[in-house]
């Protein structure tokens, strides 16, 4: 059996197993000398707060945002469908807190945009909705399949 040792003068305020130093932001791009940078631009995010970033409808109530991995928020959306649809498009560029549950194509894909907007408005207040859309190449049709377990 191990012998217990008491050290009254030692204070452990932040043990290495618990304390993780805050890392600075990673460098965006490091190129070897034989590459030449063709574009290096920094642009602020969209500042529009009165329209949904996905369906462009007016926001008449408190907007929903995409939650980032570090606790921040980005975007303004009228519904969870719009938020998750845009989040599924940008998840390779923005570190998200959680995986999106819904994935629709951008409205530019649809011939009848009003049908998609009506679906968004119909399901705006529903919880537990998940699903996606499927593009049928032969018939040039997009099937939207949204489901709920509730």
Swiss-Prot record:
Keywords: Activator, Late protein, Transcription, Transcription regulation. It comes from the Viruses. One of its GO terms (molecular function) is zinc ion binding. Pfam families: Pox_TAA1, zf-FCS. Belongs to the orthopoxvirus VLTF-2/OPG126 family. Interacts with itself. Interacts with the late transcription factors VLTF-1/OPG093. Acts with RNA polymerase to initiate transcription from late gene promoters. This is Viral late gene transcription factor 2. The gene is OPG126.
């Amino acid at each position: 059996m191990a012998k217990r040792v008491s050290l009254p003068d030692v204070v452990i305020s932040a043990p290495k197993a618990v304390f993780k130093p805050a890392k600075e932001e990673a460098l965006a791009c490091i190129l070897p000398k034989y590459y030449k940078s063709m574009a290096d631009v920094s642009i602020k995010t969209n500042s529009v707060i009165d329209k949904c970033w996905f369906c462009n409808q007016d926001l008449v109530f408190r907007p929903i945002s995409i939650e980032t991995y570090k606790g921040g928020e980005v975007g303004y959306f009228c519904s969870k469908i719009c938020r998750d649809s845009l989040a599924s498009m940008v998840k390779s560029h923005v570190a998200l807190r959680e995986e999106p549950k819904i994935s629709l194509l951008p409205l530019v894909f649809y011939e009848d945009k009003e049908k998609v907007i009506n679906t968004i408005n119909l399901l705006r207040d529903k919880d537990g909705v998940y699903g996606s859309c499927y593009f049928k190449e032969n018939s040039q049709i997009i099937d939207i399949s949204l489901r709920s377990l509730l």
